A protein has these predicted regions:
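A glycosyltransferase accessory/donor-loop signature
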Residues: 1-7, 162-282
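Short, acidic, metal-binding catalytic loop of nucleotide-sugar glycosyltransferases
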Residues: 21-29
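Conserved donor-nucleotide/metal-binding helix-loop-beta segment in metal-dependent transferases, i.e.
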Residues: 105-142
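Active-site-proximal specificity loops/subdomain of glycosyltransferases
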Residues: 43-90
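Catalytic metal- and UDP-sugar-binding loop of GT-A-like glycosyltransferases, i.e.
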Residues: 101
Length: 282
């Protein structure tokens, strides 16, 4: 299973938390962890040791910003927004499929069902976040002029068909679109505007559960998608928004305690890994 992340040093522990949650809840197999980074992470050794303890292979990818010399770059549009969109240019060419995950997610059931989703005829698989009304969806379609897409996809969980993406997704198209449009969420807007019609929709209640909307999920499911249902069935919880469960404040929510449990286990894992020299970490 190939996993992709894009972080800086502030999110090493959060990334390790995601990895631990995947390892504990996904059937044993090989995990290859690719991490896009603007500069080599100062906590590279921490991450390497954690991956070794989890039995995962760690592949850091330092991004050369010269790749984006023709891209529109401003304070609002830093080069890092292009990493996810152009991951196929940065990853080894012999990779065929990879799952991108934001570092603010938690895996609570087997990830294999998402990873094994067929992408035949599609560039990506992603989820559209549920709402009680479709007002936001209509606004986004008008804003991005992508009326033939199923909806507005959240790019925090993105299964990538790299072989097809390499043929269809071009940096010049992305740069030109950003240059000629004012965007709210630059990389996510580009993904939806240019490639929304080529994204396979997967259920957000399973693969990209927005933890802010637990009440909405229960309402639209007529009471079926309760906390117990989520714990049995949902694969990925996504801690969207400004409130984050690892913050000392602004960390309320029905799934905060669950995250804190994994986060605490991760800190213990990191501490244990630091006590061992690299050659003794298995």
């Amino acid at each position: 299973m190939n996993l992709l992340f894009s972080i800086n040093d502030k999110f090493v522990t959060q990334l390790a938390t995601v990895l631990l949650s995947i390892k504990l809840n996904t059937q044993a197999q090989e995990f290859n962890v690719y991490v896009l980074q603007k500069e080599k992470l100062k906590r590279t050794e921490d991450l390497e040791r954690v991956c070794k303890q989890l039995g995962m292979n760690y592949f850091p990818i330092k991004v050369n910003d010269q790749l984006f010399s023709k891209a529109p770059v401003t304070d609002r549009y830093p080069t890092t927004i292009y990493y996810r969109l152009l991951a196929h240019c940065l990853l080894p060419q012999d990779l065929h499929k990879i799952l991108y995950l934001d570092a603010d997610v938690l895996c609570i059931n087997d990830l294999s069902s998402l990873y094994e989703t067929s992408l035949e005829g599609y560039l990506y698989a992603s989820a559209i976040h549920t709402n009680l009304t479709n007002t936001t969806e209509v606004i986004n379609k008008i804003r991005l002029q992508n009326f033939d897409a199923d909806g507005y996809y959240n790019s925090g969980v993105l299964l990538m068909n790299l072989d097809t993406i390499r043929k269809k997704v071009k940096d010049t198209d992305i740069f030109n679109y950003i240059r000629t449009h004012t965007l709210l969420l630059p990389d996510q807007d580009v993904l939806n505007a240019l490639y929304g019609r080529y994204i396979k929709s997967v259920p957000d209640q399973l693969y990209n559960f927005d933890i802010r909307k637990g009440g909405i999920y229960e309402t639209i499911s007529f009471g079926e998608w309760t906390n117990d249902w989520v714990m049995r069935n949902t694969v990925i919880l996504h801690y969207c928004g400004r409130d984050k469960p690892w913050l000392p404040t602004k960390n309320s929510g029905r799934y905060t305690a669950l995250y804190k449990n994994y986060f605490q286990m991760t800190n213990k894992l990191i501490s244990a890994a630091l006590l061992l020299p690299p050659e003794e970490v298995n």
